[in-house]
Amino acid sequence: TWGDTTNTNLELIAEGLSYGTEAITTNADTHTSTVADGASDPARSMFIKYTGTLDSACTITIAPNTLSRVHFIENGTSGSQDIIIKQGSDDAADKVTIPAGDTKAVYLDGAGSGAVVRDAFAALNVGNLSTTTAGTSNLRLGVNAGNSIQSGGNYNTVLGDEAGTALTTGDNNVAIGFEALKTEDAHGNNVAVGYQTLKAQDAGGAAYNVAIGYKAGTAITDGVSNTLVGGLTGDAITEGDSNVAMGESALSTDTLGSKSTAIGSFALNAQNFTTATDSHNTAVGFDSGKSVTTGVNNTLIGGLAGDAITDGDGNTAVGHEALSADTSGQKSTAIGRGALLRQDFTTATDSHNTAVGHEAGANILTGTLNTLMGSRAGDELTTGGENTVYGFQALSADDVGSHSTAIGKNALASQNFDTATDSNNTAVGHDAGAAVTIGVQNCLLGAFVGDALTEGLHNVAMGYAALSADTKGNYSVAIGAGALANQNFSTATSSFNTAVGEEAGNDITTGVQNTFIGALAGDATDDGIGVTAVGYLALSANCADGNTGVGHSAGKSITGGNNMCLGAGSGNTGSPGGNMTTNANEIALGNGDVQECNIQVDWTVASDQRDKTDFTALDVGLDFVNALKPYTYKWDKRIKYVSDEDRDTVDLDTITHDGTHKEDWLDIGFKAQEVEVLEKAAGYKIAEKTNLTTKLTGDGKQYGMQYSKFVPILVKAIQELTAANTALAARVKTLEDA
């Protein structure tokens, strides 16, 4: 008895699953088997074999009649008599008859005196052909199942009424289900599982067909290499080859199509080729490609993917509802949920649209030649064509614009034309051109580049945040991080500004016609016009109009206008022009290190009398020249004693030199300060701009000489000397004549 002792319980389980034998008294008409706890009771075993010799049928009662259980009972008696299994005392209750030599699974319901016994597998007709001489290792179960198999038919498994009834010499077939593989006779290597699967097949050779499911492949006659899984899957195929279909009614209309793959309920449900055709269609997902009739070379993966396509060719759709409205469009690629969701060409059209991402190109109707990659990329486009879009929500507002390139999150996200327009905008980078609405022919490369532009035209910007504040400016070129970053025209304006270099022209707001080339070139100018700065830090202060600075740091402190600084460091402290700040209308050539200036021809200096006024005879001549003190000397410039990093702030008046930086070459000239004394003595240089030959730089730190101005003075001196000589000659002649 089952109790608390583990070993006893395990022993009871083992005995219950064991094989028991019980002998019937010779020629007995009745027999009782009792299921009890005794270890020697065979009736407690699941498998019972009755033995003994009988001369008539014997009724066996299994007690008690209140116990519900299942037994596998074998009639192992001799004498060819039946045994009849009962449980209740009511002779009218159902019993099970087991012929001599047979085994049956019987169920006892334990209902007391009226208990019934059922044949658990009553519908099965079991025959073991291995006991006959027909074929080798065949198994058949069912009415007429495999009943035609001959000695040449081997290794067949046939289960089900009328299954494989025509098989004679076919090998290696599996037919399970009513009328499964019913017609095939002499060929093998087929698997048919399900009601009437492969029912009509009668191939001319090894078919290698696999059909699993209600009426799967039921119409196939001589089609080969098909794999069909699911109720009514491929149930119309007759001669089609190499098809794979899985799911209810998948590929259920086609008759002669080959090389199709349909996985999912109703996938490729309507495909039907009336002539032998290699469709090369692949549909995976519920209703995917369900409307395809004669379209070929389509790949449709996802629920409802391409489910409206009828005769379109060469399409690829991956994702739920991808390309789900188009009927006749061709050569489209839609990857992502709802990608190309509404595209619909009613006539055969090579769309060449590619959309990859959630709802990418979801609203395209008839636009063509679009490439859209990224979630919601180009998702409002309807008829626009030849757009290239990569990035989340890039070009996500436009519906009819064409020829746009938007690469990066939100690139050209606001562009939207009311009428068909070739925008020819290119925006590459995070938020590049994100605010452009109707601007055209802009090229914007870099994160946040031109991200405030709305209606601007013909702008080129490249580099992080270049041209990032302007809304309506036109014809600007900004190349470099932060170039023209603050330019902003609130009305349509052709700026014609060009800035190349990191933060070149960074502070320009409304200035126009400026050219800045070099990192930080012109980076503080805001409203200057016609400024040209070429070189690192050239004209890097907020300068007025018309300045030109060419060279590293050329004129970097200038705020005045119409100056020209040519050469590295020109117009800075220590250069010939000094540190130019508020200067105007000046030219500075080179820096303090220049030793020679070479030119092929003479300078031509403007001197048209029509452009002059207030003429007065020069009164400085021979006496002035005679007072000059010419010298030979070597340069020992104060700026040489200052480090590069201090030159912008040093006061040259505080510098003394000790000869350690003097040049080794000889020069000739005057001391400007001595000449200035002579000029003042002659009545000049009393007020600003009344000097003759000396000049103090704008910062007041360096004197210079304008040697070309000595020409009129020397001419005057020669004239005075000539007059004196003439007078002297006249006196000499008078004396000689006296």
Where are these regions (language model features)?
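Extracellular receptor-binding modules and their adjoining Ser/Thr/Gly/Asp/Asn-rich linkers
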Residues: 8-13, 17, 21-24, 102-117, ...
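Glycine- and small/polar-enriched repetitive beta-structure motifs of secreted/surface proteins
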Residues: 125-607
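Acidic, glycine-rich loop-and-strand cores that form catalytic or ligand-binding grooves
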Residues: 621-637, 642-652, 656-658
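C-terminal intramolecular chaperone/auto-processing assembly modules
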Residues: 124, 681, 686-738
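Glycine-rich, acidic and aromatic/proline-enriched surface loops and short helix-turn segments
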Residues: 627-630, 672-687
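Acidic, glycine/polar-enriched metal-coordinating patches/loops
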Residues: 51-125
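Exposed extracellular interaction/assembly regions and N-terminal maturation sites
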Residues: 1-83
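Fibrous stalk/shaft segments of extracellular and virion attachment machinery
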Residues: 1-20, 61-63, 84-86, 92, ...
